[in-house]
Amino acid sequence: MANVYDAMKKSQAQQAARRPPGQPEGEAWAGAAAAGPTQLYRPPLGRCARNVVIPYDPAGRIAEEYRALRDNLCCQFREKKFCLLVTSAEPREGKTVTCLNLAFALAEDRDRRTVVVDCNLRRPQVAALLRTAAAPGVADVLRRAATLADVTWNTMAPNLFAIPAGRAVAYEVGDLLRSPVLDDVVADLRHQFDYVLVDSPPIRVAPDVGFLGRAATQALLVVRLRKTRRPSVSRAIALLHAANIKPLGLALTCR
């Protein structure tokens, strides 16, 4: 009996080692598929925030709206691969929540790998919503203090990954995003992943989106219904064009 018990414990340990981090024992996310190759496996740090709705209510109306957004975006790309900037005109428009829900919707394609990159180095939100560590992250890679493998985290979905912003002080953000290292980072991400979503600062608040035009030449503009005024949206679109970033469309959010 002792040998059987030891064998069972060994089998359970092997299964746990293969289980994607972020997925509790005996629990599967509705959109989950078999895990593909990843950079690192890390212990789970807890479930993501409830306003990232797809893992919690995959059959709900809001989840379906994010899938419709996903399908509309994918129709605009001949190849099923893209690198997309997700931004907003003003703060508090639901930009990061939209970015993460879109990422979970994309991750329902079991044959594709998706990564969310938090490039809002001034006010990052991705790590807080996904309950992952805030650092190291993008800032550390741009300083050459870490590699992409060091900062890439698993999520509740086996083929969805996240890279937090890391820690940066305001005066160095421009220099970090201006660094040629950013070009290498983007090239590596495009090679490793099918869908790259870059969460950026609000375009009318911070000047960083201009630098991020090197990372993604197309953008989704998030607009809060009955809050964001039309002149603000028009100005945001003009700023995207000035940075050589093509707006692919608007995503309307509401409370």
Question: Predicted regions span which residues?
Answer:
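Long, basic/Gly/Ser/Thr-rich N-terminal segments
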Residues: M1-Y41
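P-loop/Walker-type NTP enzyme "switch/lid" segment
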Residues: L40-R67, D71, C75-R78, A89-E93, ...
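Pre-Walker A (Motif I) flank of P-loop NTPase domains
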Residues: K80-L84
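Hydrophobic positions on the alpha1 helix immediately C-terminal to the Walker A/P-loop
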Residues: T98, L102
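Generic hydrophobic/aromatic pocket-lining and core-packing "Φ" positions
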Residues: A103, V209-G210, V233, I237
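Aromatic pocket-lining residues of Rossmann-like dinucleotide-binding sites
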Residues: L106
